[in-house]
Amino acid sequence: MTTNYVLVETCALVQNRFGMRAIKVFQEDIVPVLRIEWIDKAVHHAAMQVVIAAPRKKLSLVDCVSYETMRLLGVTTAFTLDKHFKEQGFICLPA
């Protein structure tokens, strides 16, 4: 499971590092097999409130949207190298 916010972030990264050809491959070969949760206004607002209230500068809106979505869906494990997911109480793979 991923969110449309993560897709936007990923597209920007792929385009910047690998170019438009890689974006086409990503869109045609990878996106169709993903379960995508489309973020609504309520989740966006809740995540933004966390960002605004956060004591640290490096807390991203995309990460906060992911945390909120995972909690709402009962997801406890994340495939990520981002240590912030562990700080938020999620199990991270690879460990």
Residue ranges and their predicted role:
Residues 60-76:
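Acidic, metal-associated active-site segment
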Residues 2, 59-60, 82, 94-95:
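Histidine- and aromatic-rich ligand-binding microenvironments
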Residues 1-56, 68, 87-92:
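PIN-domain endoribonuclease scaffold, especially VapC-family toxins
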Residues 9, 63, 82:
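Acidic active-site catalytic centers that drive phospho-/nucleotidyl reactions
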